UniProtKB/Swiss-Prot annotation:
Induction: By iron deprivation. There is a cross-link at K39 (Glycyl lysine isopeptide (Lys-Gly) (interchain with G-Cter in ubiquitin)). Belongs to the FET4 family. The lineage of its organism: Eukaryota, Fungi, Dikarya, Ascomycota, Saccharomycotina. It is found in: Membrane. This is Low-affinity Fe(2+) transport protein. Present with 573 molecules/cell in log phase SD medium. It comes from Saccharomyces cerevisiae (strain ATCC 204508 / S288c) (Baker's yeast).
Length: 552
């Protein structure tokens, strides 16, 4: 690893992940009461920590009682520094209810001001600039949230695989004292597992605790639907048609005519016409990014709560097995989760994604905003100055939208493969032990075969290829050339802004839909994993009862 790359945060690197599950500490169980009083196990709440004595190359993962996940290394393989921890904190803040309500308050105030002052030009520019800056910051947080969430889930799978390998090693040993018939998990015991899980959770639905949750669920479902995409493009084509209607050209008298001459009063496809769609899309982007960040936070909280219980059961299983075999010394095996091979193009995309999602992107953003403020006085704070920051963040946000979608498509596939591997290993162990597992606990999401779903899947695949990122770069270069030809006038900047904002909003709808599908699949997998751990815990409790543990 080069010193320069390490200084910059090692952008683009995707090293293999090595992890060893910690060995259960018998003292933290027995300190709750007499070591022979196994009923006390039910009240134990374990905060799971990785074994700090492992080699430096191992990545540690810690899960708190609230479900928050913390890792010792980031997704590029480097230990987390102050900047990484700060960005992770901002990701959590951005998805909070407080930020959600603040955004809506700002939006309402902006609407009221527009009504009072009859929606002047600068009023629209303020919304576009504000939204562009917000979108620029949110893209950084969304990218980091995607990359860190997947890195955390891969480490979770590594923890589960490491312990599962030990479980398989211990449980498949046969001893003369054991009677497999006595530890068979009955059908009614398996059915009782469902009593511990909300039926909606088994289907991957987020729990609804209040009106806010209900609003978020409905909004994400409709904004990320194929119908919303169709309505969006209908609105765009209607707007294009309205461009043929002459509108205020923004010129000052004397006019050369109503629609003729070099200084007409009215003009087709005017700057005002472009401003209308820019403002409308800016509001839509503001709402969508806020909902997306919030939905991701709620999803992480949901899965985190299940993972706390899953790790607790893993600890209990590990304790009972090791107590039976009187072995608290043998460590769990090290599990290596290999990174997927990438083409040169995808490595470049990952490099850019890491620039967005690390401190480098923040530093670049601060430098750009400082420069923009600095040139305000020489430009006399005119309309062009107001538009400059919106144009920059709009073009960058346009590229970010393509990169976000392409990266998300790949990391979800990698994440799903690891959860699928855990489910496969679980079921193989169940088969060896003669444990029956209901089909609904296999971790497979309900199949959807509607026309709308297939259409949406096709759109998602098209929008998630490296070629789509290349096309976005070509479009940006073309728009920069056009704006330069117009000397970055108001019209030139609006031309650079308008198509990028439209496509960025469309990609955000596609991304929102992709998040809905992937998050639902993950919730199905996590709840199924929870159910399988309860079944395995029941098996272990029957196979190694208290009397047998006392005798040994």
């Amino acid at each position: 690893m080069g010193k320069i790359a390490e200084f910059l945060g090692n952008p683009g690197a995707r090293p293999d992940v090595h992890h060893r599950a910690p060995t259960v500490d018998c003292k933290q169980y027995e300190e709750f009461g007499d070591s022979n009083d196994y009923k006390n196990d039910d009240v134990v709440r374990v905060v799971s920590h990785s074994d700090e004595s492992t080699d430096d190359e191992l990545c540690n993962v810690n899960l708190t009682e609230t479900g928050a996940i913390f890792t010792s290394k980031g997704f590029t393989g480097l230990s987390k520094g102050f900047t990484d921890k700060t960005l992770d904190f901002l990701v959590r803040v951005a998805g909070s209810q407080a930020v959600f309500f603040i955004v809506w308050i700002i939006l309402i105030i902006w609407v009221v001001i527009g009504i009072v002052y009859n929606a002047p030009f600068n009023w629209q520019v303020v919304m576009q600039d504000g939204q562009s800056i917000q979108s620029y910051v949110w893209d950084t947080l969304l990218m980091r949230q995607q990359l860190m969430s997947t890195h955390e889930q891969i480490l979770i799978c590594g923890r589960l695989k490491s312990r599962l390998a030990s479980f398989k090693n211990y449980l498949t040993r046969s001893t003369p004292e054991e009677e497999k018939a006595d530890c068979t998990v009955e059908a009614n015991e398996v059915s009782s597992v469902e009593n511990h899980i909300d039926p909606s959770a088994i289907n991957g639905e987020l729990p609804v605790e209040n009106w806010y949750d209900r609003l978020s669920n409905v909004a994400s479902r409709y904004m990320g639907s194929i119908a919303a995409m169709v309505i969006f493009w209908i609105g765009i084509f209607v707007w294009i048609g309205c461009g043929a209607i002459p509108k205020d050209a923004g010129n000052t008298p004397p006019y050369t005519g109503e629609t003729t001459g070099s200084n007409p009063r009215l003009k087709k496809f005017s700057d005002a016409w472009q401003m209308y769609i820019n403002t409308a899309v800016a509001v839509s982007l503001l709402i969508c990014t806020t909902f997306l960040q919030n939905i991701r936070a709620r999803h992480d909280y949901f899965t985190g709560r299940f993972l706390v219980d899953i790790f607790d059961m893993d600890e209990k299983i590990d304790y009972r097995i090791r107590k039976h075999f009187n072995d608290f010394e043998t460590p769990h095996p090290v599990v290596t989760i290999e990174s997927k091979k990438r083409s040169t193009g995808r490595k470049m995309i990952d490099w850019y994604a890491d620039i967005i999602g690390t401190g480098i992107g923040v530093l670049i953003g601060v430098a750009v905003f400082a420069t923009w403020i600095g040139i305000g006085s020489p430009m006399k704070w005119d309309d062009n100055w107001w538009l400059i920051i919106g144009t920059y963040t709009g073009l960058i946000g346009f590229l970010d939208g393509f990169v976000l979608r392409e990266v998300y498509f790949r990391i979800v596939q990698h994440e799903e493969k690891n959860y699928s591997d855990v489910a496969k290993e679980d079921l193989e162990l169940f088969q060896e032990l003669g444990i029956e597992c209901p089909e609904e606990f296999s971790g497979k999401a309900p199949e959807i075969n509607t026309i709308g779903y297939r259409t949406s899947q096709y759109i998602n695949r098209i929008c998630s290829t490296p070629w789509s990122v290349l096309v976005s770069v070509i479009i940006i270069i073309g728009l920069i050339c056009i704006a330069s030809g117009l000397r970055w006038s108001t019209t030139g900047q609006l031309i650079a802004n308008t198509p990028t904002m439209i496509i960025e909003e469309f990609f955000l709808l596609v991304l929102l839909q992709a998040h809905n599908w992937a998050d639902r699949q993950r919730r199905v997998e996590v709840t199924a994993l929870y159910a399988r751990r309860r079944i395995l815990l029941s098996y272990v409790e029957k196979r190694f009862p208290e009397v047998m543990m006392l005798e040994k």
